[in-house]
């Protein structure tokens, strides 16, 4: 499985070296500029581009929770980026609205097309490619084995029941949390992603590809009932945003999070002494679904400097830069990349991540099936209902029955 994900040649493609036009400033917004080692990767490769091209890059940092709303508002107001990162979920509505430029010519000129991951197909419409993958790492179970051991748990939980038992033991014996997830309703995307991990993990979803609403599917009721149980019994912290939940994990107070390898990157950067005790494991839900949202690079249709933006994109996708994304950031890059044998020996869990990504992919793009264009509105209705359920203002079954009716009525108006 590792070779399916982490395979490529190591030689640079001579044709990928761009010819730069000089003297412009590129506007490049992202939520990643200040994300620890991820931000360092971007800044290092951007500096290489600036030195080679004579151009400048305006590194516009926008928080992840606000990114979609802010950047769409800016584009509508005429402040159009030259190159930008987008969450995979943003692609369908932006393509549908005509916001993005086709990248096929850029891909051909850059010489990286044969190295792009298969997930590039998500950005293809009517034969045109409107984005290229930035990263496609799966969410799975990030585990603090030391905390589990302190609670008397010697084996990684493989079922939801075992996860619950481990959480009880962690609380009783260490005072920590066995499980944590972002449940700050002011950050709806992260709340929705976590719900996907559970409803897909129980073999269902909020909707189906043909548009059928399945909010009150019995499997969803069971999945959300488990989530509420963790909150009600104090086994998971209440009201935390995803950043605060990750901070608790870094402080050694959380045993398991359903997270991506970016949390491993954060541990390596901020608490390297913890790395020996941290593993990346299969999610202990019935289907083991590894939600894969990822991110893409795009160039807006009205970008002022599309040629220079293509050159910068080509710099980011050069083979050495992609290998460094894998080895330095411990995440799957947007193209195939060959890690060194030394790296794999020191980071055996990366091979496990690759196998999880290949074996249990699900929820590509964080979008409800059948509602890719209307995903934002759909997600918000789900999160509003989860807020009612988690706060105790309604039961799980009543809340999801109400959500079923609400979504069906809304769907009928589309």
Which sequence ranges carry the predicted segments?
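Gram-negative bacterial Sec-dependent N-terminal signal peptides
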Residues: 1-20
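Short helices/loops that flank or line small-molecule/ion binding pockets
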Residues: 68-79, 97, 147-148, 165-169, ...
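C-terminal lobe and pocket-closing loops
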Residues: 262-274, 286-384, 412-414
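Hinge/lid segment of periplasmic solute-binding proteins
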Residues: 88-138, 162-164, 174, 190-191, ...
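Glycine-centered hinge/linker elements that transmit conformational signals in sensory
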Residues: 167-168, 173, 210-238, 279
């Amino acid at each position: 499985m590792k070779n399916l994900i982490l395979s490529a040649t190591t030689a640079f493609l001579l044709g990928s070296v761009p010819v730069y036009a000089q003297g412009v400033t590129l506007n490049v917004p992202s939520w990643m500029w200040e994300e620890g080692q991820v931000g360092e990767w971007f800044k290092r490769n951007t500096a290489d581009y600036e030195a080679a091209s004579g151009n400048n890059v305006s590194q516009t940092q926008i928080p992840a929770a606000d990114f979609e709303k802010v950047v769409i508002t800016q584009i509508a107001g005429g402040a159009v980026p030259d190159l930008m990162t987008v969450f995979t979920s943003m692609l369908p509505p932006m393509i549908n609205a005509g916001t993005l430029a086709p990248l096929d010519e850029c891909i051909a000129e850059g010489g990286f097309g044969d190295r792009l991951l298969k997930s590039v197909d998500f950005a293809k419409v009517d034969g045109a490619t409107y984005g290229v993958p930035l990263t496609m790492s799966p969410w799975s179970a990030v585990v603090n084995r030391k905390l589990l051991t302190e609670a008397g748990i010697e084996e990684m939980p493989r079922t939801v029941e075992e996860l619950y038992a481990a959480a009880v033991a962690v609380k009783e014996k260490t005072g920590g949390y066995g499980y944590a997830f972002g449940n700050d309703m002011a950050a709806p995307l992260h709340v929705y992603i976590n719900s996907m991990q559970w409803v897909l993990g129980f073999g269902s979803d909020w909707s189906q590809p043909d548009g059928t609403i399945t909010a009150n599917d019995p499997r969803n009721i069971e999945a959300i009932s488990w989530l509420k149980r963790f909150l009600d019994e104090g086994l998971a912290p209440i009201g935390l945003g995803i950043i605060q939940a990750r901070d608790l994990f870094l402080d050694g107070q959380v045993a398991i999070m359903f997270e991506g390898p970016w949390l491993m990157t954060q541990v390596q950067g901020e608490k390297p002494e913890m790395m020996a005790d941290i593993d990346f494991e299969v999610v202990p839900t019935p289907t083991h679904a590894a939600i894969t949202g990822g991110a893409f690079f795009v160039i807006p249709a009205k970008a002022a400097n599309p040629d220079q933006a293509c050159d910068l994109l080509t710099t980011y996708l050069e083979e050495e830069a992609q290998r460094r994304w894998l080895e330095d950031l411990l995440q799957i890059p947007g193209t195939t990349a060959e890690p060194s044998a030394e790296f794999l020996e020191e980071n055996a869990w990366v091979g496990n991540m690759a196998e999880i990504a290949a074996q249990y992919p699900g929820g590509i793009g964080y979008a409800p099936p059948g509602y890719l264009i209307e995903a934002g509105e759909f997600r918000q209705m789900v999160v509003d209902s989860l807020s009612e359920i988690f706060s105790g203002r309604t039961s799980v079954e009543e809340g999801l029955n109400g959500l079923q009716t609400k979504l069906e009525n809304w769907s009928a108006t589309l």
